């Protein structure tokens, strides 16, 4: 017996000694790397949040009419639960990092789709992503490029220009004197990503058992589809070159060039381009950059991507969109960064989406219903129209291009996001998957416009309408062999674009009493182009 005890003690001592040596020698070891720690933290946070929601209305039978009525109002107790839960979720994302931060950022971008308590709390994740050490950065570069940093670069800044959920960017100078930006993937994120997504899927399914009306599987599906693409930096480089070629006619757009000879799946080398963030009004004022011009350029660029090309940069948060004065011409320029996340729209989706926006802009409510339902909205088409435009249903009915959004309307929309959360989550589960990233992109762009004070101008809607007209005309011409029919389509396109120009001219002089009468006459003589 004593011999067995001695043997057990010896083996235990050896195991502890080996563990001690491993822990001491492995400089990159972090408790967060252990699956049990990450899983335990996620399960515990989900359980606490679920318990908080379940007990907030413990005196009211769950699922009863009274429960639904209380929940549908902005009841102070529920607002407090939203806030507590959002903070817990934010802490979980910061602790587990990587994929969790990426998903948290996605949720934080959905300003008009989720309760404000969640979006305002989770927005900090865009600026609080944890940083990899220089030892880890050197390790990734050594493994992927087969050389040390000093062999590749004349100089390399240890302090990153920016840190995101999946990677961080450093400024460096090549031996030939060219200044470059070096994007390096966090070393552990790729290995953890598939396990993290599986964990999220299990937790979302568990929460659905407790709260059947809340359907968030769309979020897991999106992460499962997009994360592998975002983790492949060669794919990001290809996207950058594609969008640069696609939008080459916009002289205000700058996409940094890729250095393919020093790029891998985890390291991306690109031309270094300096500038201020697109929501930084002070930077624009100091550099004499016209805020309204930048807002118009941004709207033109994204309308072209969505309606004409169907290839959309889906992460336009301010850190990924810079502005600057072109060093040669002195003209204002938009610098588009981070090309890891793009959405390729099918032709059917793109054309239906064009028709829907034309209907919304020109207040054709019959077609709003028709094309919303074609895009999967069903009987919830009024809510879907409000989600797309971030306007109230009254404003949609009156015409979203007739008046800009007011502070009162904006507050009403944000409050309704909490009130209609089950219906919103139902819609997000039933619309085409392509729509999810488009909605996220729309909300990020609105956030930029709100920061610049240029949101929802009539001019921006007219620019969208121009792109829709061009896209629909191009589709019709592509599907006919008749020269006469193609000529007819081209004439109709030119006439509809002329209407848009005339409408825009009238809006510029709308302060005159005569303008309203002229506008009414024009709208009566020339129906909305669809």
Curated annotation (Swiss-Prot):
Its EC number is 2.7.-.-. ATP binds at residues 161-169, 183. Its main location: mitochondrion. Keywords: ATP-binding, Kinase, Mitochondrion, Nucleotide-binding, Serine/threonine-protein kinase, Transferase, Transit peptide. One of its GO terms (molecular function) is ATP binding. It is an enzyme of class 2 (transferase). One of its GO terms (biological process) is negative regulation of mitochondrial fusion. Residues 155-467 form the Protein kinase domain. It is found in: Mitochondrion. One of its GO terms (cellular component) is mitochondrial inner membrane. The active site is at 315 (proton acceptor). Changing residue 315 to A: No effect on role in maintaining mitochondrial structure and function. Belongs to the protein kinase superfamily. ADCK protein kinase family. Appears to be essential for maintaining mitochondrial cristae formation and mitochondrial function by acting via YME1L1 in a kinase-independent manner to regulate essential mitochondrial structural proteins OPA1 and IMMT. The action of this enzyme is not yet clear. It is not known if it has protein kinase activity and what type of substrate it would phosphorylate (Ser, Thr or Tyr). PANTHER family: AARF DOMAIN-CONTAINING PROTEIN KINASE 1 (PTHR43173:SF19), ABC1 FAMILY PROTEIN (PTHR43173). This is AarF domain-containing protein kinase 1. It comes from Homo sapiens (Human). The gene is ADCK1.
